[in-house]
Regions:
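Short hydrophobic/aromatic beta-strand immediately N-terminal to the Walker A/P-loop
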Residues: 1-3, 30
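A substrate-engagement module of RecA-like helicase motors
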Residues: 26-163
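Walker A (P-loop) phosphate-binding loop of P-loop NTPases
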Residues: 7
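Conserved lysine of the Walker
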Residues: 10-11
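Signature of the SF2 helicase/ATPase Hel1-core->accessory helical subdomain module
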Residues: 4, 14, 20, 37-48, ...
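Residue-level marker of positions within ordered structural domains that often coincide
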Residues: 19-20, 76
């Protein structure tokens, strides 16, 4: 367990050895952050910055080409089956039609299906649960979009072959609760902001 102040480069301090270990041993390392925002920061800033520095220093990492995957809970991904069924409903209110049109423009260009790309406003966030992937509404055996058109499936498949898998505490604990059925098998785990893990575990695994 290591503790350090804000802004001194903790993420770089654990990312570099994690990447090197994963490449040299051909085994995945899972990095768990407290929130999705921190996940996004690692993927969009910290990891690219680190790789850029290594490239400038001409430091070659041992092993094969580095593969990094980000994985979130299923509700972060659009379900094309639910979206398509909704947009075919006649007589939709203008707010819903506008939201579905925005999604139409997006689904033709997105490779991830991750709602983070959309920067949804409050009203759109209220509508999102009607189109997101949902365990209760997942019918893989009768879905025309599964597996090739299922963004959740594709994200999990990408994680299967990754050296570094970036998740959040909620998903990490969800995987634990489901006996490891979400994440690929791993033996090395880095927990960023570990002091938040107990609270999340209480929310995820506790009951009244």
């Amino acid at each position: 367990i290591l503790e350090a102040g804000t802004g001194i480069g903790k993420s770089i301090a654990y990312l570099l050895p994690s990447i090197i270990f994963a490449l040299e041993n051909s085994t995945p390392v899972v990095v768990s952050t407290n929130t999705i925002n921190l996940q996004e920061q690692l993927m969009s800033k910290d990891i690219p910055d680190l790789l850029q520095v290594l490239a400038k220093a001409k430091k070659r990492l041992a092993g094969s080409e580095l593969h990094i995957a980000q994985l979130k809970g299923r509700s972060n991904y659009i379900c094309l089956r639910r979206w398509n069924a909704w947009r075919q409903t006649p007589g939709l209110p203008w707010e819903e039609s506008r939201f579905l049109l925005r999604l139409l423009l997006w689904v033709n260009s997105t490779s991830s299906g991750d709602r983070a790309e959309l920067n949804l406003n409050r009203a759109e966030l209220d509508l999102w649960p009607r189109v997101c992937a949902s365990e209760d509404n997942c019918v893989t055996t009768r879905c025309n979009y599964y597996p090739a058109g299922c963004f959740l499936y594709r994200a999990r498949q990408m994680a299967q072959g990754a050296h570094l898998i970036v998740v959040n505490h909620a998903l990490l604990l969800s995987d634990l609760a489901k006996s490891g059925s979400i994440l690929p098998e791993y033996h090395r785990l880095v927990v960023d902001e570990a002091h938040r893990l107990e609270e999340e575990a209480t929310d995820q695994l506790g009951y009244e």
